[in-house]
Amino acid sequence: MSDIKEFISNGFVIKRKLFSNEEIDKLNQYIAIRQDKEKSARETTTSTGKLTMTMWNHPSEDLFGKFSTNERIVKPMEIFLNDEVYHYHSKIIWKNPGDGGFDWHQDYGYWYHNACLYPDMASCFIMLDKANKENGCLKVLKGSHRVGRISHARSDTPEQTADNERISELEKRHESVYIEAEPGDALFFHANLLHASDANKSQNSRRTLIVCFNTKSNN
């Protein structure tokens, strides 16, 4: 199956070794030196513990910006979404040993409230560390983007997640796929694809750089 057919059918595409070990090592070294002091970090409490993320809206001229606007990400995005795209925002998920996961949700469940009329949006999830079930890798409901936007609400924690009743039914019909991957691998996924992650039960970090895009016609 071609990448575009896979994206349309499943809602996601995995590109192995989109970035080399050297490129990821360089980015990780840059993160360690910068400690991301100039970005806005925030900690949230989820159903399985705390989770820290760093988010920014405008790609700068630094190494973060170079990754966020790299043609290896942008060109596939424009093919998958069939339109010119622009950088919506980027973030780093800092998932240290013992940190929590995140319940099932859709990105468009949030972005819908930012005056984005259509779900013609997607994200690229770049692995900075090895990702596996033990350290809380991402998991997706294959093909769930086709159900459309699901209502999101707060449960017992500050996070907003997808309606539990609908999730229960969808889990019966859609395969849950764990995205186990190596540093430099990347996951492209539709804004309506349901995704989640479990807590990090390992002794290793699971950091990811996520670059999100909107289509020009949806601005």
Regions found by a protein language model. Give the residues of each.
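Non-heme Fe(II)-dependent double-stranded beta-helix
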Residues: S2-N10, K15-A115, A153
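Short hydrophobic-aromatic micro-motifs
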Residues: I14, C124, L187-F189
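Short, solvent-exposed loop/turn segments at secondary-structure junctions
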Residues: F19-N21, I92-K95, D99, A131, ...
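Non-heme Fe(II)/2-oxoglutarate
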Residues: R34-T46, P183-F188, N192-N219
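Generic beta-strand structural signal
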Residues: D83-S90, G100-F102, D120-I126, G136, ...
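Short, structured patches in soluble enzyme cores that scaffold and shape functional sites
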Residues: Q106, I126-K130, K142
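Short, conserved beta-strand element in jelly-roll/cupin
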Residues: N114-K133, E180, C212-T215
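Double-stranded beta-helix
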Residues: K133-L194, D198, N218
